[in-house]
UniProtKB/Swiss-Prot annotation:
Membrane topology value: Multi-pass membrane protein
Protein name (Swiss-Prot/TrEMBL): NADH-ubiquinone oxidoreductase chain 4
Oligomer status and interactors: Core subunit of respiratory chain NADH dehydrogenase (Complex I) which is composed of 45 different subunits.
Cited Pfam families: Oxidored_q5_N, Proton_antipo_M
Transmembrane residue ranges: 22-42, 60-80, 92-112, 113-133, 147-167, 193-213, 224-244, 256-276, 284-303, 308-330, 350-370, 393-413, 435-455
One biological process term in Gene Ontology: mitochondrial electron transport, NADH to ubiquinone
Organism listed in the record: Caperea marginata
Length: 459
């Protein structure tokens, strides 16, 4: 794992020592090279003899998320260029450094073997994200958003630390690989029930579960483009990854403890999809759509069948790429029109026809059209939830219809209609932006040719 962690850390001196006109090109090309080397991890055996150490390891569950994290850094750097055009040189370098620090922490988090190291990295990702949101966001409300983000996630994950110390006392170890084989079932005592809640709460806030989701739209809307991308694509997946890792250790409590959370996530899925239909703010709409997609993942993980686990991992990867692409598109609109309100940005298809193609592709992947990887994830999760309980098919069906509705609503509001008079002199789209969109779409389409590499350890 060090062959990814060390080069990523060395991107920091590279950024600070680069010549002024080479900051972007140096950091982007080198991070792209690192992300290409990370693709070697896909060629993996089940026994992990190749990349196992006492501190860092990777298995078929963490590998796809790891590669998604590394793939996203060059894309974030490409997306941020015009956002930072008027900033001073030190601030540009600081911004890039923050992104690199965040990426390093995320790599260490996805590959940690010890639960405490996992927890420390889980918390440490808050700091660079908070700095990115509160320093480079667009409106003044970013301070409020940063506060929400910090306190929701901190208060959610403090009980996890207590639960981990309790686990250490009862089992004598906090190693993932040992605890997976620790077969003693937990008895349903009060202390164990509280431990279950403490373990799950941190990840449910991060996912976010409906009801604990209020920080997400705020943070997304106020963050700069790179902040939104990394928040949607990777930071929400920390919750899913943590749940997938820790549910193995909490058997058989999850079977009866999960019911209220399952109901809440299935209901929240419908609610947040419906909220999307009433949004005027483009970024807010995409943020709420992430909440509804992640609710499906929560439900799938809590059911705990092999199919639902596979569907959850596939859906997490697919959603990471899709929502990141939607935020990039929203940002390219914002840079030209300087407003996130959809009514002010309509009729853009006439001015930017090639961008309209990307908008169409992104909307279709968002509503899980074949042959994208989103379809595979949704099929597996919907089928496993249906076989767990038949009446849920009504909730699922409603959700799929509403998802299609808001995706098409977003497409039609931004691309069709009579364009408003202040859009007459907008700048044409750049090659950089088209490359950015292509680098989001190509993995989505290629993964559908060979989806088994992202279906997790149970495939």
């Amino acid at each position: 794992m060090l062959k990814f962690i060390i080069p990523t850390m060395m991107l920091m001196p590279l950024t600070w020592l680069s010549k002024n006109n080479l900051i972007w090109i140096n950091s982007t090309t080198h991070s792209l090279l690192i992300s290409f080397t990370s693709l070697l991890l896909f060629n993996q055996f089940n026994d992990n003899s190749l990349n196992y150490s006492l501190t860092f390891f990777s298995d078929p569950l963490s590998t796809p998320l790891l590669i998604l994290t590394m793939w996203l850094l060059p894309l974030m750097l490409m997306a941020s260029q015009s956002h930072l055009l008027k900033e001073s040189l030190t601030r540009k370098k600081l911004y890039v450094t923050m992104l690199i620090v965040l990426q390093t922490l995320l790599i260490m988090m996805f590959t940690a073997t010890e639960l405490i190291l996992f927890y420390i990295m889980f918390e440490a990702t808050l700091i660079p994200t908070l700095i990115i949101i509160t320093r480079w966001g667009n409106q003044t409300e970013r301070l409020n958003a940063g506060l929400y983000f910090l306190f929701y996630t901190l208060t959610g994950s403090l009980p996890l630390l207590v639960a981990l110390t309790y686990l250490q006392n009862t089992t004598g170890s906090l190693n993932f690989l040992l605890l997976q084989h620790w077969t003693q079932p937990l008895s349903p005592t009060w202390s164990n029930i509280f431990m279950w809640l403490a373990c799950m709460m941190a990840f449910l806030v991060k996912m976010p579960l409906y009801g604990l989701h209020l920080w997400l739209p705020k943070a997304h809307v106020e963050a700069p483009i790179a902040g939104s991308m990394v928040l949607a694509a990777v930071l929400l997946k920390l919750g899913g990854y943590g749940m997938l890792r820790i549910t193995f250790m909490l058997d058989p409590l999850t079977e009866f403890m999960a019911y209220p959370f399952l109901m809440l996530s299935l209901w929240g899925m419908i609610m947040t999809s419906s909220i999307c239909l009433r949004q005027t703010d483009l970024k807010s709409l995409i943020a709420y759509s992430s909440v509804s997609h992640m609710a499906l993942v929560i439900a799938a993980i809590l059911i705990q069948t092999p199919w639902s686990y596979m569907g959850a991992t596939a859906l997490m990867i697919a959603h990471g790429l899709t929502s990141s692409m939607l935020f990039c598109l929203a940002n390219s609109n914002y840079e030209r029109i300087h407003s996130r309100i959809m009514i002010l940005a309509r009729g853009l298809q006439i001015s930017l026809p090639l961008m309209a193609t990307w908008w169409l592709l992104a909307s279709l992947t968002n509503l899980a059209l074949p042959p994208t990887i989103n379809l595979i994830g949704e099929l597996l999760t919907v089928m496993s939830i249906f076989s767990w309980s038949n009446p849920t098919i009504f909730l699922m069906g409603t959700n799929i219809v509403i998802t299609a509705l808001y995706s098409l609503y977003m497409l039609i509001m931004t691309q069709r209609g009579k364009h408003t008079h202040h859009i007459n002199n907008i700048t044409p789209s750049f090659t950089r932006e088209h490359a950015l969109m292509a680098l989001h779409v190509i993995p989505l389409l290629l993964l559908s040719l060979n989806p088994k590499i992202i279906l997790g350890p149970l495939y």
